Amino acid sequence: MSKTYFTQDHEWLSVEGQVVTVGITDYAQEQLGDLVFIDLPQNGTKLSKGDAAAVVESVKAASDVYAPLDGEVVEINAALAESPELVNQKAETEGWLWKMTVQDETQLERLLDEAAYKELIG
């Protein structure tokens, strides 16, 4: 069973074992508007928490998406190259950005649960 976390940078994380799926929240995609391009990290990229890992570009602006944890990218959502609008349509499911391994599970303890994230976006 997966557990979901959120960051103050408006990312969601779904944790299953040692693999974390990362995406931007529905709130974030609403703020950005229609996405037109997404630049994802490459498989095998080693990320440190806080690294700019991806870029989401909308008709309004381009925004960095930051690595929420230390780890290595093991899969990217290749469908987004042809269909970046998946993030607008299904940000917290089919619009995921990348999957990564977790190096330090204690970093999860510093993330937000759903209630804390809802309070943040209030």
UniProtKB/Swiss-Prot annotation:
Keywords: Lipoyl
CDD domains: GCS_H (cd06848)
UniProt modified residues of type N6-lipoyllysine: 60
GO biological process: glycine decarboxylation via glycine cleavage system
Record text on cofactor binding: Binds 1 lipoyl cofactor covalently.
Subunit structure: The glycine cleavage system is composed of four proteins: P, T, L and H.
Name of the protein described by the UniProt record: Glycine cleavage system H protein
Protein encoded by which gene: gcvH
